[in-house]
Amino acid sequence: IDKFLEIEEDKFIKKLEPVYKAINKVKNKIKKNQTLICFAGAPWTLLVYMLNKKSPAKNFNIDKMLKDEFLINLILKKLDSFICLHLEKQIQAGAEICQVFDSWAGIVPKNKLYNYCYIPNLKISNHLKAKKIPSIFFPKGLKYNYKTFANIVRPNCISIDSTINPTWARKSFNNIPIQGGFNPKSLLKSKSEITREVIKYLKTFKNYNYIFNLGHGVLPSTNPDKILHLIKTIRDF
């Protein structure tokens, strides 16, 4: 933590130069009609990894982590600044849209959501809007607080996890475009079941600005053929 608080912007950027070089290489390889998305973790999620040094376990002691409120606010403020800078650099390298992952938003205590989740993400959202950079935000695990997040942060697009009812999402976000939601576990089912569930999603979001995607990452045990089937089903709809 001390090392992070002492690091300066130029050293931070130098450390991440391989990321920007990789984006530039990819940009030069893809077709002109293909959009390149860059990403970063949200301040709260990065803070969780910094203090826990790994993915939080079921017995993760959130109260212990939140003891030093002054330190947390100090770290979040610096993370906000560095994340904005990192996203800008990725856009300069060739990316066209930014996605911000708040993968551990779901473990923020309810009385801390405003300060630790909504406001840090709002700062990033406002910064990107000022630079005319489109954004997608993914506050995983917020459940029905997703609506409050969307109303406060007002991203260009909001990504939903698999616990969110798609019908509820369509009615709740004041026409903000929606991405994701499809359960990765569904890809472990038969092709006919996958087809049925994909069609259900596509019908729910018909005539709505929707980007089909999973509600989280592909599970390691997923058969690649099922992914190809998923893509074909979407394209044939």
Please identify what each model-predicted range represents.
Residues 1-10, 33:
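A contiguous, low-structure linker/loop signature
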Residues 15-237:
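Active-site loop segments of alpha/beta catalytic cores
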